[in-house]
Regions:
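Transmembrane helix-loop-helix hairpins at lipid-water interfaces of multipass membrane proteins
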Residues: 10, 16-73, 77, 150-155, ...
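An intracellular "coupling" helix at the cytosolic face of ABC transporter transmembrane type-1 domains
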Residues: 11-14, 99-103, 119-132, 136, ...
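Alpha-helical transmembrane segments of multi-pass membrane proteins
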Residues: 14-16, 22, 63-82, 133-140, ...
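Hydrophobic alpha-helical transmembrane segments of ABC transporter permease domains
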Residues: 21, 25, 29-33, 58, ...
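Juxtamembrane helix-loop junctions of ABC transporter transmembrane domains
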Residues: 21-22, 29-42, 63-110, 114, ...
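Short intracellular "coupling" helices and adjacent cytoplasmic loop segments at the cytosolic face
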Residues: 47-48, 83, 91-115, 119-121, ...
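Helix-loop-helix
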Residues: 49-53, 144, 148-165, 232-306, ...
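ABC-type nucleotide-binding domain
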Residues: 325-583
Length: 583
Protein backbone atom coordinates (compact mmCIF):
# COMPACT_ATOMS: atom_id res chain seq x y z
CA UNK A 1 0.00 0.00 0.00
CA UNK A 2 2.79 2.43 0.94
CA UNK A 3 4.64 1.73 -2.31
CA UNK A 4 1.44 2.39 -4.26
CA UNK A 5 0.93 5.75 -2.55
CA UNK A 6 4.57 6.88 -2.74
CA UNK A 7 4.58 6.24 -6.49
CA UNK A 8 2.30 9.27 -6.84
CA UNK A 9 4.91 11.72 -5.51
CA UNK A 10 5.93 12.37 -9.11
CA UNK A 11 7.72 15.69 -9.57
CA UNK A 12 7.70 16.29 -5.79
CA UNK A 13 10.18 13.50 -4.99
CA UNK A 14 13.04 16.00 -4.63
CA UNK A 15 11.12 18.01 -2.01
CA UNK A 16 10.07 14.78 -0.28
CA UNK A 17 13.73 13.62 -0.07
CA UNK A 18 15.13 16.99 1.06
CA UNK A 19 12.56 17.38 3.87
CA UNK A 20 13.78 14.48 6.08
CA UNK A 21 17.43 15.34 5.40
CA UNK A 22 16.94 18.95 6.50
CA UNK A 23 14.78 17.84 9.46
CA UNK A 24 17.52 15.45 10.61
CA UNK A 25 20.16 18.20 10.41
CA UNK A 26 17.84 20.56 12.31
CA UNK A 27 17.45 17.93 15.06
CA UNK A 28 21.24 17.51 15.33
CA UNK A 29 21.65 21.27 15.74
CA UNK A 30 19.02 21.25 18.50
CA UNK A 31 20.79 18.43 20.32
CA UNK A 32 24.07 20.40 20.39
CA UNK A 33 22.54 23.35 22.25
CA UNK A 34 22.34 21.83 25.79
CA UNK A 35 26.02 20.80 25.60
CA UNK A 36 27.05 24.31 24.51
CA UNK A 37 24.99 25.73 27.39
CA UNK A 38 26.90 23.40 29.74
CA UNK A 39 30.19 24.92 28.50
CA UNK A 40 28.82 28.43 29.13
CA UNK A 41 28.02 27.49 32.73
CA UNK A 42 31.14 25.42 33.50
CA UNK A 43 33.78 27.32 31.47
CA UNK A 44 32.33 30.80 31.67
CA UNK A 45 29.97 31.56 34.54
CA UNK A 46 31.51 29.36 37.26
CA UNK A 47 35.06 30.43 36.34
CA UNK A 48 34.08 34.07 35.79
CA UNK A 49 35.50 33.97 32.25
CA UNK A 50 33.44 36.44 30.16
CA UNK A 51 35.42 35.60 27.03
CA UNK A 52 34.19 32.01 27.29
CA UNK A 53 30.62 33.26 27.88
CA UNK A 54 30.79 35.46 24.76
CA UNK A 55 32.48 32.75 22.65
CA UNK A 56 30.02 30.00 23.57
CA UNK A 57 27.13 32.48 23.49
CA UNK A 58 27.94 33.36 19.86
CA UNK A 59 28.28 29.65 19.07
CA UNK A 60 24.83 29.07 20.63
CA UNK A 61 23.36 31.85 18.49
CA UNK A 62 25.00 30.44 15.34
CA UNK A 63 23.78 26.88 15.99
CA UNK A 64 20.27 28.14 16.80
CA UNK A 65 20.23 30.26 13.62
CA UNK A 66 21.32 27.27 11.52
CA UNK A 67 18.63 25.12 13.18
CA UNK A 68 16.04 27.83 12.45
CA UNK A 69 17.07 28.08 8.79
CA UNK A 70 17.03 24.30 8.39
CA UNK A 71 13.61 24.15 10.07
CA UNK A 72 12.15 26.81 7.77
CA UNK A 73 13.50 25.07 4.67
CA UNK A 74 12.28 21.67 5.89
CA UNK A 75 8.83 23.13 6.57
CA UNK A 76 8.67 24.69 3.13
CA UNK A 77 9.74 21.51 1.34
CA UNK A 78 7.35 19.45 3.49
CA UNK A 79 4.43 21.71 2.56
CA UNK A 80 5.38 21.56 -1.13
CA UNK A 81 5.76 17.78 -1.12
CA UNK A 82 2.58 17.04 0.86
CA UNK A 83 0.41 19.46 -1.13
CA UNK A 84 1.77 18.18 -4.43
CA UNK A 85 1.38 14.58 -3.27
CA UNK A 86 -2.27 15.21 -2.38
CA UNK A 87 -2.85 16.90 -5.73
CA UNK A 88 -1.34 13.97 -7.61
CA UNK A 89 -3.45 11.52 -5.61
CA UNK A 90 -6.64 13.42 -6.41
CA UNK A 91 -5.67 13.57 -10.10
CA UNK A 92 -4.95 9.83 -10.17
CA UNK A 93 -8.18 8.98 -8.35
CA UNK A 94 -10.24 11.27 -10.58
CA UNK A 95 -8.68 9.84 -13.72
CA UNK A 96 -9.35 6.28 -12.55
CA UNK A 97 -12.94 7.12 -11.62
CA UNK A 98 -13.47 8.42 -15.17
CA UNK A 99 -12.82 4.86 -16.38
CA UNK A 100 -15.22 3.28 -13.90
CA UNK A 101 -18.21 1.43 -15.25
CA UNK A 102 -21.64 2.04 -13.76
CA UNK A 103 -21.08 -1.12 -11.72
CA UNK A 104 -17.86 0.28 -10.19
CA UNK A 105 -19.68 3.46 -9.23
CA UNK A 106 -22.52 1.42 -7.72
CA UNK A 107 -19.92 -0.31 -5.52
CA UNK A 108 -18.62 2.88 -3.87
CA UNK A 109 -21.54 5.33 -4.23
CA UNK A 110 -21.04 8.92 -5.33
CA UNK A 111 -20.88 10.26 -1.76
CA UNK A 112 -18.24 7.66 -0.85
CA UNK A 113 -16.05 8.67 -3.77
CA UNK A 114 -16.39 12.37 -2.85
CA UNK A 115 -15.31 11.61 0.74
CA UNK A 116 -12.29 9.65 -0.46
CA UNK A 117 -11.18 12.47 -2.78
CA UNK A 118 -11.64 15.20 -0.16
CA UNK A 119 -11.55 14.17 3.51
CA UNK A 120 -9.41 11.05 3.04
CA UNK A 121 -6.83 12.74 0.81
CA UNK A 122 -6.61 15.72 3.21
CA UNK A 123 -6.00 13.34 6.13
CA UNK A 124 -3.27 11.58 4.18
CA UNK A 125 -1.74 14.92 3.17
CA UNK A 126 -1.52 16.04 6.82
CA UNK A 127 -0.12 12.67 7.89
CA UNK A 128 2.45 12.71 5.08
CA UNK A 129 3.66 16.17 6.10
CA UNK A 130 3.95 15.11 9.72
CA UNK A 131 5.73 11.86 8.82
CA UNK A 132 8.16 13.74 6.57
CA UNK A 133 9.16 16.04 9.43
CA UNK A 134 8.35 14.53 12.81
CA UNK A 135 8.93 10.86 12.03
CA UNK A 136 12.48 11.74 10.96
CA UNK A 137 13.21 14.63 13.29
CA UNK A 138 11.93 12.87 16.42
CA UNK A 139 13.99 9.63 16.11
CA UNK A 140 17.15 11.62 15.27
CA UNK A 141 16.45 13.86 18.25
CA UNK A 142 15.89 10.83 20.44
CA UNK A 143 19.00 8.90 19.37
CA UNK A 144 21.44 11.82 19.46
CA UNK A 145 20.04 13.13 22.75
CA UNK A 146 20.54 9.68 24.31
CA UNK A 147 24.10 9.55 22.93
CA UNK A 148 24.95 13.01 24.30
CA UNK A 149 23.32 12.20 27.65
CA UNK A 150 25.21 8.90 27.95
CA UNK A 151 28.47 10.75 27.25
CA UNK A 152 27.75 12.82 30.36
CA UNK A 153 26.51 9.99 32.60
CA UNK A 154 25.49 6.50 31.55
CA UNK A 155 23.84 5.73 34.87
CA UNK A 156 21.63 8.85 34.79
CA UNK A 157 20.69 8.04 31.18
CA UNK A 158 18.90 4.95 32.52
CA UNK A 159 16.22 7.34 33.84
CA UNK A 160 15.47 8.27 30.23
CA UNK A 161 15.30 4.66 29.11
CA UNK A 162 12.74 3.79 31.80
CA UNK A 163 10.58 6.72 30.66
CA UNK A 164 10.91 5.67 27.01
CA UNK A 165 9.85 2.07 27.72
CA UNK A 166 6.87 3.31 29.76
CA UNK A 167 5.74 5.70 27.01
CA UNK A 168 6.16 3.18 24.19
CA UNK A 169 4.05 0.64 26.11
CA UNK A 170 1.31 3.20 26.78
CA UNK A 171 1.29 4.49 23.18
CA UNK A 172 1.11 0.96 21.78
CA UNK A 173 -1.83 0.17 24.06
CA UNK A 174 -3.61 3.31 22.85
CA UNK A 175 -2.85 3.10 19.12
CA UNK A 176 -3.55 -0.53 18.23
CA UNK A 177 -7.31 -0.53 19.01
CA UNK A 178 -7.70 3.00 17.61
CA UNK A 179 -6.96 1.95 14.01
CA UNK A 180 -10.21 -0.03 13.78
CA UNK A 181 -12.25 2.82 15.24
CA UNK A 182 -11.08 5.24 12.55
CA UNK A 183 -12.25 2.79 9.87
CA UNK A 184 -15.76 3.24 11.27
CA UNK A 185 -15.28 7.02 11.52
CA UNK A 186 -14.68 7.39 7.79
CA UNK A 187 -17.59 5.13 6.90
CA UNK A 188 -19.71 7.55 8.92
CA UNK A 189 -18.19 10.41 6.90
CA UNK A 190 -19.54 8.66 3.79
CA UNK A 191 -23.02 8.55 5.32
CA UNK A 192 -22.83 12.20 6.35
CA UNK A 193 -21.72 13.32 2.89
CA UNK A 194 -24.46 11.22 1.29
CA UNK A 195 -27.05 12.93 3.49
CA UNK A 196 -25.75 16.41 2.65
CA UNK A 197 -25.45 15.69 -1.06
CA UNK A 198 -28.94 14.21 -1.29
CA UNK A 199 -30.53 17.02 0.70
CA UNK A 200 -28.84 19.90 -1.12
CA UNK A 201 -29.38 18.46 -4.61
CA UNK A 202 -33.07 17.85 -3.84
CA UNK A 203 -33.68 20.97 -1.72
CA UNK A 204 -36.62 22.08 -3.89
CA UNK A 205 -38.37 18.73 -3.38
CA UNK A 206 -37.67 18.86 0.36
CA UNK A 207 -39.22 22.31 0.63
CA UNK A 208 -42.19 21.53 -1.61
CA UNK A 209 -43.12 18.57 0.63
CA UNK A 210 -42.29 20.51 3.83
CA UNK A 211 -39.82 17.79 4.84
CA UNK A 212 -37.15 20.05 6.32
CA UNK A 213 -37.74 18.64 9.81
CA UNK A 214 -37.38 15.05 8.59
CA UNK A 215 -34.18 15.86 6.67
CA UNK A 216 -32.78 17.72 9.68
CA UNK A 217 -33.39 14.66 11.85
CA UNK A 218 -31.72 12.38 9.29
CA UNK A 219 -28.71 14.71 9.10
CA UNK A 220 -28.56 14.98 12.91
CA UNK A 221 -28.49 11.17 13.21
CA UNK A 222 -25.59 10.99 10.75
CA UNK A 223 -23.75 13.73 12.70
CA UNK A 224 -24.38 12.01 16.04
CA UNK A 225 -23.09 8.69 14.73
CA UNK A 226 -19.92 10.39 13.45
CA UNK A 227 -19.59 12.33 16.73
CA UNK A 228 -19.85 9.20 18.88
CA UNK A 229 -17.24 7.31 16.85
CA UNK A 230 -14.88 10.28 16.86
CA UNK A 231 -15.29 10.83 20.61
CA UNK A 232 -14.63 7.12 21.14
CA UNK A 233 -11.37 7.40 19.18
CA UNK A 234 -10.29 10.70 20.72
CA UNK A 235 -11.07 9.50 24.25
CA UNK A 236 -8.48 6.76 23.76
CA UNK A 237 -5.97 9.17 22.25
CA UNK A 238 -6.49 11.59 25.15
CA UNK A 239 -4.29 9.32 27.32
CA UNK A 240 -1.27 10.48 25.29
CA UNK A 241 -0.75 13.79 27.08
CA UNK A 242 -1.22 12.49 30.66
CA UNK A 243 1.27 9.69 29.93
CA UNK A 244 3.70 12.25 28.55
CA UNK A 245 3.33 14.54 31.59
CA UNK A 246 3.86 11.61 33.98
CA UNK A 247 7.08 10.80 32.13
CA UNK A 248 8.29 14.43 32.12
CA UNK A 249 7.63 15.03 35.81
CA UNK A 250 8.95 11.59 36.78
CA UNK A 251 12.19 12.19 34.87
CA UNK A 252 12.61 15.68 36.34
CA UNK A 253 12.12 14.42 39.90
CA UNK A 254 14.44 11.44 39.41
CA UNK A 255 17.11 13.53 37.69
CA UNK A 256 16.90 16.26 40.34
CA UNK A 257 17.34 13.70 43.11
CA UNK A 258 20.11 11.59 41.59
CA UNK A 259 21.72 14.48 39.70
CA UNK A 260 22.16 16.52 42.87
CA UNK A 261 24.03 13.63 44.47
CA UNK A 262 26.23 13.26 41.39
CA UNK A 263 27.09 16.98 41.43
CA UNK A 264 27.88 16.92 45.15
CA UNK A 265 30.09 13.84 44.64
CA UNK A 266 31.88 15.53 41.73
CA UNK A 267 30.76 12.89 39.20
CA UNK A 268 29.27 15.58 36.96
CA UNK A 269 29.37 19.37 36.85
CA UNK A 270 26.48 21.81 37.31
CA UNK A 271 26.58 22.61 33.59
CA UNK A 272 26.37 18.92 32.71
CA UNK A 273 23.37 18.47 35.02
CA UNK A 274 21.73 21.43 33.29
CA UNK A 275 22.49 19.77 29.93
CA UNK A 276 20.85 16.55 31.14
CA UNK A 277 17.67 18.49 31.95
CA UNK A 278 17.83 19.85 28.40
CA UNK A 279 18.18 16.35 27.02
CA UNK A 280 15.21 15.19 29.09
CA UNK A 281 13.09 17.75 27.29
CA UNK A 282 14.67 16.82 23.94
CA UNK A 283 13.92 13.13 24.43
CA UNK A 284 10.42 13.58 25.80
CA UNK A 285 9.53 16.17 23.17
CA UNK A 286 10.74 13.71 20.55
CA UNK A 287 8.43 11.11 22.04
CA UNK A 288 5.61 13.66 22.12
CA UNK A 289 6.15 14.37 18.43
CA UNK A 290 6.15 10.65 17.70
CA UNK A 291 2.91 10.20 19.63
CA UNK A 292 1.32 13.02 17.61
CA UNK A 293 2.59 11.41 14.43
CA UNK A 294 1.12 8.07 15.53
CA UNK A 295 -2.24 9.76 16.08
CA UNK A 296 -2.12 11.11 12.53
CA UNK A 297 -1.02 7.72 11.23
CA UNK A 298 -3.91 6.05 13.06
CA UNK A 299 -6.35 8.51 11.47
CA UNK A 300 -4.79 8.36 8.03
CA UNK A 301 -4.29 4.58 7.86
CA UNK A 302 -8.01 4.09 7.24
CA UNK A 303 -7.95 6.93 4.71
CA UNK A 304 -4.93 5.42 2.96
CA UNK A 305 -6.66 2.06 2.59
CA UNK A 306 -9.78 3.72 1.16
CA UNK A 307 -7.71 5.75 -1.31
CA UNK A 308 -5.75 2.70 -2.48
CA UNK A 309 -9.04 0.83 -2.97
CA UNK A 310 -10.09 3.46 -5.52
CA UNK A 311 -6.65 3.55 -7.17
CA UNK A 312 -6.56 -0.25 -7.45
CA UNK A 313 -10.13 -0.55 -8.70
CA UNK A 314 -10.23 -1.65 -12.31
CA UNK A 315 -13.21 -1.33 -14.58
CA UNK A 316 -15.24 -4.49 -14.93
CA UNK A 317 -15.58 -3.68 -18.63
CA UNK A 318 -12.28 -5.08 -19.94
CA UNK A 319 -11.18 -3.50 -23.24
CA UNK A 320 -11.03 -5.61 -26.38
CA UNK A 321 -7.57 -6.92 -27.29
CA UNK A 322 -7.97 -5.71 -30.89
CA UNK A 323 -10.83 -3.20 -30.66
CA UNK A 324 -13.00 -2.56 -33.70
CA UNK A 325 -12.74 1.13 -34.62
CA UNK A 326 -15.78 1.53 -36.86
CA UNK A 327 -19.46 0.66 -36.55
CA UNK A 328 -20.99 -0.52 -39.82
CA UNK A 329 -24.61 0.44 -39.11
CA UNK A 330 -27.17 0.82 -36.33
CA UNK A 331 -28.49 -2.73 -36.39
CA UNK A 332 -28.85 -4.24 -32.89
CA UNK A 333 -29.11 -7.87 -31.80
CA UNK A 334 -29.80 -9.33 -28.36
CA UNK A 335 -29.05 -13.06 -28.20
CA UNK A 336 -30.17 -14.93 -25.06
CA UNK A 337 -29.11 -12.05 -22.80
CA UNK A 338 -29.31 -12.45 -19.03
CA UNK A 339 -28.18 -9.62 -16.77
CA UNK A 340 -27.99 -8.86 -13.05
CA UNK A 341 -26.45 -6.03 -11.02
CA UNK A 342 -23.30 -7.08 -9.17
CA UNK A 343 -24.08 -4.90 -6.18
CA UNK A 344 -27.83 -5.46 -6.21
CA UNK A 345 -30.02 -8.28 -4.94
CA UNK A 346 -28.13 -10.87 -6.99
CA UNK A 347 -31.28 -11.81 -8.90
CA UNK A 348 -31.33 -11.44 -12.72
CA UNK A 349 -33.22 -8.36 -13.92
CA UNK A 350 -33.18 -9.60 -17.55
CA UNK A 351 -33.86 -13.23 -18.39
CA UNK A 352 -32.94 -14.84 -21.73
CA UNK A 353 -33.84 -11.81 -23.85
CA UNK A 354 -33.57 -12.30 -27.62
CA UNK A 355 -34.64 -9.81 -30.32
CA UNK A 356 -33.13 -7.68 -33.09
CA UNK A 357 -33.56 -4.15 -34.49
CA UNK A 358 -32.93 -3.30 -38.13
CA UNK A 359 -30.69 -0.33 -39.03
CA UNK A 360 -32.78 2.85 -39.13
CA UNK A 361 -35.74 1.18 -37.40
CA UNK A 362 -37.62 2.89 -34.59
CA UNK A 363 -38.33 0.58 -31.64
CA UNK A 364 -40.60 1.61 -28.81
CA UNK A 365 -40.16 -0.06 -25.42
CA UNK A 366 -42.93 -0.04 -22.87
CA UNK A 367 -43.16 -1.69 -19.47
CA UNK A 368 -43.94 -1.10 -15.84
CA UNK A 369 -41.62 0.23 -13.19
CA UNK A 370 -38.99 -2.42 -12.49
CA UNK A 371 -39.51 -4.24 -15.77
CA UNK A 372 -35.81 -3.58 -16.67
CA UNK A 373 -36.37 -1.16 -19.57
CA UNK A 374 -33.39 1.03 -18.60
CA UNK A 375 -31.27 -2.02 -17.77
CA UNK A 376 -31.93 -3.38 -21.25
CA UNK A 377 -30.82 -0.29 -23.19
CA UNK A 378 -27.81 0.35 -20.92
CA UNK A 379 -26.25 -2.83 -22.31
CA UNK A 380 -26.16 -1.35 -25.84
CA UNK A 381 -23.52 1.40 -25.18
CA UNK A 382 -21.90 -1.05 -22.73
CA UNK A 383 -22.58 0.86 -19.56
CA UNK A 384 -22.87 -2.63 -18.08
CA UNK A 385 -21.93 -6.06 -19.48
CA UNK A 386 -24.43 -8.88 -19.90
CA UNK A 387 -24.04 -11.84 -17.55
CA UNK A 388 -24.66 -14.33 -20.36
CA UNK A 389 -25.50 -14.03 -24.03
CA UNK A 390 -24.36 -11.26 -26.36
CA UNK A 391 -25.36 -7.77 -27.44
CA UNK A 392 -24.33 -6.78 -30.95
CA UNK A 393 -24.29 -3.43 -32.75
CA UNK A 394 -23.62 -3.41 -36.48
CA UNK A 395 -23.16 -7.19 -36.38
CA UNK A 396 -20.26 -7.00 -33.87
CA UNK A 397 -20.38 -7.82 -30.15
CA UNK A 398 -20.22 -4.59 -28.14
CA UNK A 399 -17.32 -6.12 -26.13
CA UNK A 400 -15.20 -6.10 -29.30
CA UNK A 401 -15.51 -2.36 -29.92
CA UNK A 402 -13.38 0.45 -28.60
CA UNK A 403 -15.56 1.98 -25.86
CA UNK A 404 -14.97 5.49 -27.24
CA UNK A 405 -16.10 4.44 -30.72
CA UNK A 406 -19.14 2.55 -29.41
CA UNK A 407 -20.36 5.38 -27.19
CA UNK A 408 -19.73 7.98 -29.88
CA UNK A 409 -22.06 6.09 -32.23
CA UNK A 410 -24.61 5.04 -29.60
CA UNK A 411 -25.99 8.24 -28.11
CA UNK A 412 -28.15 7.87 -25.04
CA UNK A 413 -30.39 10.33 -23.22
CA UNK A 414 -30.53 8.93 -19.69
CA UNK A 415 -33.65 8.83 -17.57
CA UNK A 416 -32.11 11.36 -15.20
CA UNK A 417 -31.41 14.46 -17.29
CA UNK A 418 -28.23 16.26 -16.29
CA UNK A 419 -27.12 19.71 -17.42
CA UNK A 420 -23.90 21.42 -16.37
CA UNK A 421 -23.19 24.99 -15.34
CA UNK A 422 -22.42 26.97 -18.49
CA UNK A 423 -24.26 28.42 -21.46
CA UNK A 424 -26.79 26.51 -23.53
CA UNK A 425 -24.17 26.27 -26.28
CA UNK A 426 -21.65 24.84 -23.79
CA UNK A 427 -24.14 22.16 -22.77
CA UNK A 428 -25.05 21.28 -26.34
CA UNK A 429 -21.38 20.96 -27.27
CA UNK A 430 -21.02 18.09 -24.83
CA UNK A 431 -22.32 16.15 -27.82
CA UNK A 432 -19.59 17.54 -30.09
CA UNK A 433 -17.11 20.06 -28.71
CA UNK A 434 -16.23 21.26 -32.22
CA UNK A 435 -19.83 21.85 -33.33
CA UNK A 436 -20.61 25.23 -34.87
CA UNK A 437 -23.43 27.41 -33.56
CA UNK A 438 -25.43 26.60 -36.72
CA UNK A 439 -25.19 22.86 -35.97
CA UNK A 440 -26.31 23.48 -32.39
CA UNK A 441 -29.30 25.47 -33.63
CA UNK A 442 -30.21 22.68 -36.07
CA UNK A 443 -30.34 19.96 -33.39
CA UNK A 444 -32.16 22.31 -31.01
CA UNK A 445 -34.86 22.66 -33.68
CA UNK A 446 -35.04 18.87 -34.08
CA UNK A 447 -35.58 18.54 -30.32
CA UNK A 448 -38.08 21.46 -30.32
CA UNK A 449 -35.77 23.29 -27.91
CA UNK A 450 -35.41 26.35 -30.14
CA UNK A 451 -38.95 27.43 -29.19
CA UNK A 452 -38.01 28.34 -25.61
CA UNK A 453 -34.34 29.16 -26.27
CA UNK A 454 -35.34 32.00 -28.59
CA UNK A 455 -37.45 33.49 -25.79
CA UNK A 456 -34.42 33.92 -23.52
CA UNK A 457 -32.76 37.38 -23.74
CA UNK A 458 -29.33 35.82 -24.37
CA UNK A 459 -30.77 32.98 -26.48
CA UNK A 460 -28.07 30.29 -26.95
CA UNK A 461 -25.69 32.16 -24.62
CA UNK A 462 -28.16 31.90 -21.73
CA UNK A 463 -26.43 30.66 -18.58
CA UNK A 464 -27.58 27.30 -17.23
CA UNK A 465 -27.18 26.78 -13.48
CA UNK A 466 -25.64 23.58 -12.12
CA UNK A 467 -28.00 20.67 -12.75
CA UNK A 468 -30.20 22.86 -14.96
CA UNK A 469 -32.05 24.25 -11.95
CA UNK A 470 -33.15 27.40 -13.84
CA UNK A 471 -34.98 25.55 -16.63
CA UNK A 472 -38.10 23.38 -16.44
CA UNK A 473 -38.11 19.59 -16.62
CA UNK A 474 -39.44 19.60 -20.17
CA UNK A 475 -36.87 22.19 -21.29
CA UNK A 476 -34.10 20.16 -19.68
CA UNK A 477 -35.25 17.02 -21.53
CA UNK A 478 -35.29 18.80 -24.89
CA UNK A 479 -31.79 20.19 -24.34
CA UNK A 480 -30.41 16.75 -23.47
CA UNK A 481 -32.08 15.28 -26.59
CA UNK A 482 -30.49 18.02 -28.72
CA UNK A 483 -27.13 17.33 -27.10
CA UNK A 484 -27.40 13.64 -28.00
CA UNK A 485 -28.40 14.43 -31.60
CA UNK A 486 -25.33 16.62 -32.07
CA UNK A 487 -23.18 13.49 -32.12
CA UNK A 488 -24.92 12.32 -35.33
CA UNK A 489 -25.14 8.80 -33.86
CA UNK A 490 -26.02 5.58 -35.64
CA UNK A 491 -28.15 4.63 -32.62
CA UNK A 492 -30.21 7.07 -30.52
CA UNK A 493 -31.70 5.88 -27.22
CA UNK A 494 -34.30 7.95 -25.37
CA UNK A 495 -34.81 6.51 -21.89
CA UNK A 496 -38.19 7.99 -20.91
CA UNK A 497 -36.73 11.30 -22.06
CA UNK A 498 -39.96 13.02 -23.11
CA UNK A 499 -42.00 12.28 -19.98
CA UNK A 500 -42.03 15.98 -18.97
CA UNK A 501 -42.84 17.18 -22.49
CA UNK A 502 -46.44 17.85 -23.55
CA UNK A 503 -47.95 15.43 -26.07
CA UNK A 504 -47.97 17.99 -28.91
CA UNK A 505 -44.25 18.71 -28.52
CA UNK A 506 -43.57 14.98 -28.12
CA UNK A 507 -45.28 14.38 -31.47
CA UNK A 508 -43.24 17.15 -33.13
CA UNK A 509 -39.99 15.62 -31.85
CA UNK A 510 -40.94 12.18 -33.18
CA UNK A 511 -41.92 13.68 -36.55
CA UNK A 512 -38.58 15.50 -36.75
CA UNK A 513 -36.78 12.22 -36.03
CA UNK A 514 -38.62 10.44 -38.84
CA UNK A 515 -37.93 13.17 -41.37
CA UNK A 516 -34.45 14.40 -40.41
CA UNK A 517 -32.62 11.28 -39.15
CA UNK A 518 -34.28 8.34 -40.94
CA UNK A 519 -31.01 6.35 -41.06
CA UNK A 520 -30.51 6.49 -37.28
CA UNK A 521 -31.77 3.53 -35.27
CA UNK A 522 -34.05 4.96 -32.60
CA UNK A 523 -35.06 3.29 -29.34
CA UNK A 524 -37.75 5.12 -27.37
CA UNK A 525 -38.64 4.06 -23.82
CA UNK A 526 -41.91 5.57 -22.63
CA UNK A 527 -44.82 5.16 -20.25
CA UNK A 528 -47.24 6.83 -22.68
CA UNK A 529 -48.36 4.64 -25.56
CA UNK A 530 -48.83 7.80 -27.66
CA UNK A 531 -45.04 8.27 -27.53
CA UNK A 532 -44.34 4.88 -29.14
CA UNK A 533 -47.40 3.93 -31.18
CA UNK A 534 -45.88 5.35 -34.40
CA UNK A 535 -42.72 3.24 -33.94
CA UNK A 536 -41.96 0.52 -36.48
CA UNK A 537 -42.26 -2.01 -33.67
CA UNK A 538 -42.97 -1.95 -29.95
CA UNK A 539 -41.35 -4.21 -27.35
CA UNK A 540 -43.39 -4.98 -24.21
CA UNK A 541 -41.24 -5.86 -21.20
CA UNK A 542 -42.59 -7.48 -18.05
CA UNK A 543 -40.36 -8.50 -15.13
CA UNK A 544 -37.24 -8.62 -17.29
CA UNK A 545 -38.75 -10.76 -20.02
CA UNK A 546 -40.22 -10.01 -23.43
CA UNK A 547 -44.00 -10.18 -23.17
CA UNK A 548 -44.72 -8.97 -26.68
CA UNK A 549 -43.09 -7.57 -29.83
CA UNK A 550 -44.87 -6.09 -32.83
CA UNK A 551 -46.55 -3.03 -34.29
CA UNK A 552 -49.11 -0.99 -32.39
CA UNK A 553 -51.96 -2.66 -34.29
CA UNK A 554 -50.55 -6.17 -33.79
CA UNK A 555 -50.09 -5.73 -30.05
CA UNK A 556 -53.61 -4.33 -29.67
CA UNK A 557 -54.88 -7.60 -31.11
CA UNK A 558 -52.55 -10.08 -29.44
CA UNK A 559 -50.99 -8.68 -26.23
CA UNK A 560 -53.11 -8.51 -23.09
CA UNK A 561 -50.80 -6.15 -21.18
CA UNK A 562 -50.61 -3.74 -24.10
CA UNK A 563 -54.39 -3.83 -24.51
CA UNK A 564 -54.96 -3.02 -20.84
CA UNK A 565 -52.48 -0.14 -20.88
CA UNK A 566 -53.92 1.28 -24.09
CA UNK A 567 -57.47 1.11 -22.76
CA UNK A 568 -56.51 2.67 -19.42
CA UNK A 569 -54.68 5.56 -21.11
CA UNK A 570 -57.30 6.28 -23.76
CA UNK A 571 -60.23 5.96 -21.38
CA UNK A 572 -58.97 7.29 -18.06
CA UNK A 573 -55.52 8.74 -18.62
CA UNK A 574 -53.87 5.93 -16.66
CA UNK A 575 -50.32 4.68 -17.03
CA UNK A 576 -48.60 1.35 -17.37
CA UNK A 577 -48.22 0.75 -13.66
CA UNK A 578 -51.94 1.01 -12.99
CA UNK A 579 -52.94 -1.67 -15.49
CA UNK A 580 -51.04 -4.76 -16.45
CA UNK A 581 -47.75 -3.46 -15.13
CA UNK A 582 -46.01 -6.16 -13.19
CA UNK A 583 -48.71 -8.79 -13.01
Amino acid sequence: MIKKLVSHLGEYKRAAILTPILSALEAIMDVLLPTIMAFIIDQGIEKGDMNAVVKYGLLTFLVAAIALLLGVLAGRFAATASTGFAGNLRDAMYENIQHFSFSNIDKYSTAGLVTRMTTDVTNLQNAFQMIERMCVRAPVHLVFALIMASMISRSLTMVFLVAIVFLVAVLAGIMVPTFGIFDKVFKNYDNLNASVQENVSAIRVVKSFVREHFENEKYTKACESLYKQFVHAESRLSFNNPAMLVSVYGCNIALSWFGAHYVLNGAITTGQLNALFGYIMNILMALMMLSMAFVMIAMSAASARRIVEVLDETTDLPPAKQPVQQIRDGGIEFEHVTFKYKHGSGQPVLNDVTFSIRPGETLGIIGGTGSAKSSLVQLIPRLYDAETGSVKVGGVDVKDYSLDVLRREVSMVLQKNVLFSGTILDNLRWGDENASEEECIRVAKLACADVFIERFPDKYNTWIEQGGSNVSGGQKQRLTIARALLRKPKVLILDDSTSAVDTATDAKIRKAFREEIPGTTKIIIAQRISSVQDADRILVLDNGQINGLGTHEELLKTNKIYQEVYNSQTQGGGDFDKQGGEQ
